[in-house]
Structures are given as structure tokens and as C-alpha cells.
Amino acid sequence: MKIIFTISFTCLLYANLSFAQTQPAWQLLGQLQTRSAKEIKASTWSIGGETLDRDYTDYHAYKKYLGPLGAKRIRLQGGWAKCEKEKGKYNFAWLDSIVNDALSQSVSPWIELSYGNPIYVGGGDAKLAGGIPTSAEALQAWDNWVRATVTHFKDRVVEWEIWNEPDISKTITGDNYADFYIRTAEIVRSVYPKSRLLAFGLAGVQRLEFVEPLFKKLQQQNKLHLVDVFTYHGYSPNPDNSYPAIEKLRQLVWKYKPDVVFMQGENGAPSTPKAITIGAMRDYDWSELTQAKWDLRRMMGDHGRGIATNLFTISDIHYAEGDHMVGVNSKGLLKTNPDKTIERPKMAYAAAQHVFSLFDNTVELQSKIKPQVNSDKISAFVYHKKGKSLLTVWNHEARPAEEFTPQPVQIKVEGSFQQPVYVDLITGKVYSIPTKNYKKTGTTYQFINIPVPDYPVVIADKSILQFK
């Protein structure tokens, strides 16, 4: 039934959305077979399930789309203010139902510990860009809630992120976030010694001065073991323009602790014009096509650099009065109705399915192999699976466009392609590459006049793909 659902959805999607992109004039071999999370043993992919703590999305409206999407993890926000509406009394029932359902679909939740709780004086704000708890009473209450939350979920949740985008708050500094992080991380680790601790959820990847105080204090206190993963966001209209700043961020963190894993903790593009959407990148016009292109470039740009990705987000988000912004953030893979129920999947949902199904942990990045291309506007990364090769390639010159004519590109790469095929990651279509478009010299393959669009496509050996 899962396969029937997926195929029917794909046909419906492309019947209703025009795809303004020239497809190769090559033999069509079939369609990538997508896999549910239950059918994927392991991968680095996560999907955003944010704002359930403030009821801006409805998990139970979108949960039937979660497993078939294929992501192996989902980011949730713990919601101190939603759990503790009366001092000292916790209600985890709302979060229990979500965690249990996600696990039943083989999707592992990771929980961000946030936000503040206004029932306490100095308790911080229960919203994006708000303050952390500061009074003695509120900090003790925070400690108690963190301890209770981790105790309650420790048999089901391994990963714990501490706060979200502290650097956009007007009241949080790098120094006081550092102190807050350390006290919280120590509680998590004391309750659950095998926990995996995620730091920051940093909004601005260029904010090195905000980041360094934490690592200085951790080093001084001999507590660098309290950071396992560094999460960052950093929205850019051209996703490929982010990486120089991300590399500087990595070098800063690795100076203190070289084994910190980097994860894109939240990123995705809107799907509507600027007059409609809110949130990051709202100053540009977007469509469901350019959203799909942008999301693919972020995912494969991260993956090619060994960075895990949490794609933001599964459902459009309905921000309410009193928060950092008001309106619909259209970065969801699922288009919502005004009551937060799901109207339908967007083009980006299918694109993400194709990535999550294909790039699991059996596909190994070959970071030492550098493809040679005849243009500096092209990104390309090489992978191996079962002794065969796979190549991702796209034009990164500009922000994803509504219309873009694929450019003929020459690629030379070391690999093993017994029968090379071309895969469009938006449509999922698999094409045979004509023999005139490639040649082999030893273990070097030269691909000739390969049509490369402004979003990632794949050249792979046919044997490592599952398609119908």
C-alpha cells in the first residue's frame, strides 16, 4: 500500500504542477522507487517537526506523511511552557503521543529543550527570539523541567539540543548562553550518560564571536565532552553561498574539539511569493519548484561536505500573535489548509523522498575524489555503493530559478560505471545515458555534454538504483 500511495501521489503532483524544466531527450528507463523510513536501515537525514510546542502545526494531521517521506529522524521542540502550565506539575502526554508515533514509523525524535516559561518571574519567553530564564527561581524550575523531561524520555530519545537560535535574541549573549548551555548539558548527561548533546541551533553562521565563549569556557572547565554535535541554520537565497562561512565556523569549533560533528539543524526554502510567506528569505519570490530546487541544493551541498541535514520543515507553520512573527511560513513540504490540516504534498516532498531513499548509509562519500568539470559554476561530489559509483552535479551560480535551461557540462571522474544512468531528483525519472555521451579510459570516465540544471541531478551506475 505504501508503494501505491507514493506512485499515486507522484502522478497527482505532476499533473497539477507544471514543471518548467527541460528534461533530457534520452530513453526513459523508469521512476526511482521511494522507500519509507521502515525500509531504510540508517541515514543522516532528519525532517523538521518544529513549533508543535506552540501548536503552530498539527502532528496528527501530517503524521501519515512522515514515514513515507523516508527521513530517519525528526526534530521536536520540548516546550517547557506547554509541559508546565502550573508550577511543579508536568504534562508530557502531548509529546508522548508524538514521540511514540514517530518511533512506530522508524523515525527517531531528537528534542530541543526550549523555550522559556512566563509562569515564573524571570522565566524567559515562550517564543522564538525570546530570553532564557534568568531569575534564581526560574533557573531552578528550568533545571527541574529538564531533569524531568530527560528522565521521562531517556528510553526513547538519545539526542538533546539546547535552545534554538539564541543569537537572534536581544537579551542572550554568547557568555550567558555558554553558562546556560553548560548547566543544562550537565543535567541531561547526569540523567542519561549516553545522551548525545547538540549545541546552539545557531541562526547566524557568521556569528563566531557568539560561538567562541562556549568553547572557551568548556575548555577552561575541562568539559568539552558536553558537546557532541554543533547545529547551525544560516539561510541564504543561494544555498551554495553559505559554505565559506560554514567552513570558518567548523575550523573555529574544531580548534577546540576536532571530533564535533556538524549538522545543518534547520534549513529550507519558502514555496510562495514574498507577499505571502513569513520567516527567513521572505524578501524573495518563491514557488513550489524553486523551493524543491533550493532544498535539493541544500541537502546535497551538505551531504557532499559530510554535514548531516535537518530539512525545515515537514508542514507549513502558522505563527500566531505574540510570537516573533505572525502568518504562514511556507517552508513546509506539505501545503496546509487554514486549520493546519494538510491540503497536499508539494513538489519538494517528492524531491526529499528521492534523496532520502537513495542516499542512505550504504552510500559512501568519496571526499578525496574530485571530479573535473569544465565550469566553475558547477558543484559535483562522488560516492560509492557496492563497488559502483554515483555522482551528484548541479549549477550553483545563482539562486534557483523558475526557468533554467540545463547547460551541457563535461565531467571527468575516477569511478566505476558499468551502465551509467541519469537521475532527475525532482521528478525521480531515470534516463539511459547514450554511449556517445561518455567514454572510459582505465578507471577514468569522461561524461560529455551532460545537461546540468540549477538543482542536483545524479549520474550513477544502474545496478545501484531501485526504480520501476
Name each model-derived stretch:
Residues 174-301, 305-309:
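Noncatalytic carbohydrate-binding groove/subsite architecture in carbohydrate-active enzymes
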Residues 411-430:
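Solvent-exposed beta-hairpin/edge-strand motifs
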Residues 1-21:
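Bacterial Sec-dependent N-terminal signal peptides
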Residues 69-228, 237:
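Substrate-binding cleft and catalytic face of glycoside hydrolase catalytic domains
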Residues 21-73, 85, 100, 104-106, ...:
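N-terminal carbohydrate-binding accessory modules
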Residues 434-468:
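C-terminal beta-strand-rich structural cap/linker in extracellular carbohydrate-active enzymes
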Residues 269-353, 366-376:
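Aromatic/acidic polysaccharide-binding cleft in carbohydrate-active enzymes
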Residues 371-416, 456-458:
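Carbohydrate-binding surface patches
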